[in-house]
């Protein structure tokens, strides 16, 4: 199995997942939820469909992520003024507070892995991984 790309990607994913759960995933927070929080913070008023496209996640997954973040009272939905069928998403005061902490924890989490590479190796790794998941039709 040592020659299989999928095997190595899975092991790398598990190592990153475990570290996230131990050091960032306070209260059961998952990486996808961090991604949603960050996306809403950078794009206040974004819709669930737009988040789904931006993060390349299916709509059912986004609904579950949004539901959990709403229950934590970290985000809120507001009906759009121009289209009452559309709901816009915003961070709450509590969500902004937690995201600030999470970003610090997330940077430390990332640094634990990034520090294993020099800048050239890191950039090359990112480029190679992008080749795996982009244009995968």
Where are these regions (language model features)?
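Short alpha-helical "packing" element that flanks the helix-turn-helix/winged-helix DNA-binding module
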Residues: 36-37
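Charged, amphipathic alpha-helical coiled-coil/dimerization segments
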Residues: 17, 49, 67-127
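N-terminal leader segment of winged-helix/HTH proteins
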Residues: 1-27
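Short capping segments at the starts of secondary-structure elements
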Residues: 43-47
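Helix-turn-helix DNA-binding motif, specifically the short coil turn and the N-cap/start of the second
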Residues: 57-61
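Alpha-helical DNA-recognition elements
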Residues: 22, 68, 131
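The alpha-helix within a helix-turn-helix
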Residues: 52
């Amino acid at each position: 199995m040592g020659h299989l790309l999928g095997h190595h990607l899975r092991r790398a994913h598990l190592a990153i997942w475990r570290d996230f759960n131990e050091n960032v995933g306070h209260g059961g927070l998952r990486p996808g939820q961090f991604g949603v929080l960050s996306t809403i913070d950078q794009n206040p008023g974004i819709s669930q469909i737009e988040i789904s496209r931006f993060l390349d996640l299916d709509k059912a997954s986004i609904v579950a992520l949004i539901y959990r973040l709403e229950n934590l009272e970290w985000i809120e939905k507001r009906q759009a003024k121009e289209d009452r069928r559309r709901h816009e998403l915003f961070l709450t005061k509590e969500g902004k507070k937690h995201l600030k902490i999470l970003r610090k924890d997330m940077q430390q989490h990332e640094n634990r892995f990034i520090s294993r590479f020099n800048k050239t190796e890191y950039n090359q790794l990112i480029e190679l991984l992008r080749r795996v998941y982009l244009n995968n039709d």
